[in-house]
UniProtKB/Swiss-Prot annotation:
It catalyses: carbamoyl phosphate + L-aspartate = N-carbamoyl-L-aspartate + phosphate + H(+). InterPro entries: Asp/Orn_carbamoyltranf_P-bd, Asp/Orn_carbamoylTrfase, Asp/Orn_carbamoylTrfase_sf, Asp_carbamoyltransf, Asp_carbamoyltransf_Asp/Orn-bd. One of its GO terms (molecular function) is aspartate carbamoyltransferase activity. This is Aspartate carbamoyltransferase catalytic subunit. L-aspartate binds at residues 78, 160, 222. One of its GO terms (cellular component) is cytosol. Belongs to the aspartate/ornithine carbamoyltransferase superfamily. ATCase family. It comes from Porphyromonas gingivalis (strain ATCC BAA-308 / W83). Disulfide bonds: none annotated. Pfam families: OTCace, OTCace_N.
Amino acid sequence: MKHIVSIDQCSAEDILRILDRAELFEKNPNRHLLEGKVVATLFFEPSTRTRLSFETAVNRLGGRIIGFSDASTSSSTKGESLKDTISMVGNYADLIIMRHYLEGAARYASEVSRVPVVNAGDGANQHPSQTLLDLYSIRKTQGTLYDRTIAMVGDLKYGRTIHSLIEGMSHFRPRFIFVAPEELSLPEEYKQFCREHDLPYTETKHFDEEVINNCDILYMTRVQRERFTDLEEYERVKDVYVLTNAMLSDSRPNLRVLHPLPRVGEIAYDVDDNPKAYFIRQALNGLYTRQSIICEVLGIDVAN
């Protein structure tokens, strides 16, 4: 694959190949496979984990980084079009990693770029590198990607990690439990996707032990203030679901709690020391997965 802009472009074989390669990087992340390569990280929207893990991935692979983490320092503030920005950066870099606030921006960038483009998140649309690290974390903790029940909790309307994970898991016979208030319920297009792909799901507004005790993966999300135009609506729903340690007491032994981070208050700090809390390790898995993604789009072979 020259570009990775959406998880739906990845077949099951593509996903498993990327995850298998990530395992090699977990065993040895310091492989100088990008010697002489320049990678541009263009972050038009704030990021901590995604940007730092991509930049760490490049550094550990021996490449060099150019770009920006604040769009106000770029020529976009002068009115430069995305097309011109991508075309210009493509003159200097071998790979572009981009986060943008507009849905579809990454796909457009891939259409006008002469070098590979990796989508690091575009609006409320897609976040394929997060999905791949989520899949890596699920396989690592469950021993398989197949036949898992995944409860997705919180902001299912704007949560691009949710949307991407539904599509990414569709190859592996999942069952879903969607937990959200009406204002943040899963968009109809993703419910239709589940129906078209014979993916069983249930919906509920209630986050309780009945949900927690019947899933293998509990995928928590924050309510994203930056997606709201009505702050009163945000205040009304931001704390509607909070996971506490006591709520995990009767959960399945194999249950793991995932979260794309940052958390705001939806996971209490008393959960952190529970062995079922996996979200910090999940973030570390992003390093290995993103090293694998970089090698995928650049066509770099990785030896055992």
